[in-house]
Amino acid sequence: MPTNWKDSGLRWYWVVVLVFVADQLSKQWVLSNFELYESIQLLPIFNFTYVRNYGAAFSFLSDAGGWQRWLFTFVAVGFSVVLSVWLRQQPSKMWRLNLAYTLVIGGALGNLIDRLQHGFVVDFLDFYWNTSHFPAFNIADSAICVGAALIILDSFVTGKDDKKTDGIKE
């Protein structure tokens, strides 16, 4: 385990700040410039559309009556704490895993602030084909998905790297 924060994955916490600030600024821009459900087409397959998400990914539990706000708040805080502890235990040179953890933390905190401040998450990135729309999402959601994908990728790549070095004396 690293002896100080500069040698640990905590050195990567600037990514948390970057994701959080970008997410919050983009959502504030949407709240200041869009009415609910207002949409502006940017590309033939992409809109900015302001929607409110009272649930989780893909509006999971969005109409559950309000208790889900506190469940998702607890989950976001829990994951952020656990991943921060893991960051502290990781060497700073393990870039893929450190980047993954900080992306997830930044995204979780971005959506957490929305839930606490508004009671919902502001979503606005709307991809579609013809009349079929992918569920709207935001920068925080993107960071969480990329972070989760990197965690999965790291489990495969790290496993292969470990097998390559088995039996090799340094």
Swiss-Prot record:
* Molecular function as annotated in GO: aspartic-type endopeptidase activity
Which Pfam families does this UniProt record tie to the protein? Peptidase_A8
Keywords, A to Z?
A: Aspartyl protease, Cell inner membrane, Cell membrane, Hydrolase, Membrane, Protease, Transmembrane, Transmembrane helix
Tell me the route in metabolism or biology where this protein functions: Protein modification; lipoprotein biosynthesis (signal peptide cleavage)
Record keyword Transmembrane helix present:
yes
- Indicate the transmembrane segments per the record: 12-32, 67-87, 94-116, 133-153
Q: Where in the cell is it found?
A: Cell inner membrane
Instruction: Report the principal subcellular site.
Output: membrane
Q: Provide the top EC class.
A: hydrolase
**Membrane topology per the record?**
Multi-pass membrane protein
Q: What is its EC number?
A: 3.4.23.36
Q: Would I find Transit peptide among this entry's keywords? A: no
Q: Which reaction does it catalyse?
A: Release of signal peptides from bacterial membrane prolipoproteins. Hydrolyzes -Xaa-Yaa-Zaa-|-(S,diacylglyceryl)Cys-, in which Xaa is hydrophobic (preferably Leu), and Yaa (Ala or Ser) and Zaa (Gly or Ala) have small, neutral side chains
Give the UniProt entry's GO cellular component terms.
plasma membrane
Q: Which residues form the active site?
A: 123, 141
Q: Which GO terms describe its biological process?
A: proteolysis
* InterPro entries according to UniProt: Peptidase_A8 (IPR001872)
Report the protein's function.
This protein specifically catalyzes the removal of signal peptides from prolipoproteins.
Which HAMAP family does the record match to this protein?
A: LspA
Assigned protein family: Belongs to the peptidase A8 family.
What this protein is called in its record is Lipoprotein signal peptidase
Species in which this protein is naturally found: Shewanella halifaxensis (strain HAW-EB4)
